Amino acid sequence: MKIPLIAVLGTLSLIQTAQDFADSANGKNLYSQRCAMCHGADLKATGPLARKSSPPTPDLTTAAFKKRLADYPGVIVSSVILRPNGNLIPKTLQENGVRVPPHAWSVEDFRDLNQYMSGVILKSR
């Protein structure tokens, strides 16, 4: 009985969560290239295009957004995928002469971006 238990515990110690595999450098790079122009480096809607979209870019470090992130951990990824404001993001970029090359998002990219942004948001005051 001890050997199977030891084997199970050994196997469990090798299993890591998706967060353990997240590439924070990739997440930061994706954010810097694709999000910071509106949300700013600090995620507080301080980017040069933050007030040029309608509605204005939200501050992602507010208590309300932190609660939303806690209640729905996929909110960041779903915002990228679903673009709840229709074509607001591409329209804002186009109207301001910003060209962002197309990006074929991978599962790893979403994981990395989510992990990076969540970390910055949860550390902010």
Indicate residue ranges for each PLM-predicted region.
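Short, non-ligating residues that shape and space the ligands of small metal-coordination modules
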Residues: 44-45
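Short, solvent-exposed mixed-charge patches
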Residues: 123-125
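Sec-dependent signal peptide recognition
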Residues: 1-8
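The canonical Cys-X-X-Cys-His
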Residues: 27, 31-41, 113-117
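Electrostatic cytochrome c docking/interface patches
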Residues: 13-30
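Extracytoplasmic electron-transfer domains, predominantly the class I c-type cytochrome c fold
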Residues: 52-118
